[in-house]
Amino acid sequence: MKKEAYEVEYYEPKSVLAMQADRREEKHWRKQKKGIRAGRILLGVAILLFWEVSACLGWIDDYYWSSPSLIAQTAIVQWKEKNLAYDIYFTSMSTIGGFLAGTLGGAVLGLSFWWSKTFAKIFEPYLVMFNAIPKLALAPILIVLFGIGFSSKVMLAFLMTVISCALATVSGVENVDESMETLLYSLGAARWQVFGKVVVPAVLPWMLGSLRINISLALAGAIVGEFIASGHGLGRMVIYAGTILDTTLVWVGVIVLSLLAMVMYFAVVELEKWMTEHLAIYRKA
């Protein structure tokens, strides 16, 4: 009777010196991260101080450049009157609505290129053509079709993001492992099972990679729509302030827009990390 041989893998535990080295490296990395954060804060404070001092000493014309203190006072007044809060809400909802609709629509459109090769061959030239169209040029048409309210801003943000996500998804579809598809088909898997187990996990990283760009494009689309015609929003605030030559209010809108863009960007980064972790768990399942 033959004895079956089994291979046993042994994992050599880390030495004490190696563990200490890892801890030192981790500690160094934490200190470096704290230093980077502190550097960012100090740089921002230094810019604001230089700006304020320059305005007070007359180095710059505060009629055009205003000053941080005047901008803060104007922002507080606008916030108390609830104008600024609602404008932030309006722009945020327009951006998020267009971003979600564009990402979902682009993902469905891109994945359909795998599901139907005939559809892909028919639609691909139109996808390329529409990608070449400057979407912001469509803003006046969207204003006429959907009015100056919320819908036109969402539609413009949607158009800014849907093609970007679709192209990223198509790139992922083109890089799906065909040998894995063939293997599952040979084992009797249905088409929807191959789609769920092979295609979607392979395409998701490409889709996630487009999210950071899409949130910026969606915000740009919403703002341009507000520039052209809108009753609310940060873009409307900036245009209105410009028409009455209130440069301080213009700076309030610009700074709040910058902060809003930063918050949205980092929120998408955290969403991307969370989805990447769950994608890894899904692949192991």
Name each region found by the language model.
Residues 1-35, 77:
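Membrane-topology segments of multi-pass transport proteins
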Residues 117, 252-285:
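C-terminal transmembrane helix and the adjacent membrane-cytosol boundary/short C-terminal tail
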Residues 133, 173-179, 183-203, 243:
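Short helix-to-coil transition segments within interhelical loops
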Residues 155-159, 192-225, 252:
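Transmembrane alpha-helices
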Residues 24-55:
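N-terminal signal-anchor/first transmembrane alpha helix
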Residues 25-33, 57-100:
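Periplasmic/extracellular loop-to-transmembrane helix junction in inner-membrane transport proteins
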Residues 97-127:
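Transmembrane-helix boundary motif in ABC transporter permease subunits
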Residues 128-164, 171-172:
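Generic hydrophobic transmembrane alpha-helix motif, especially the helices
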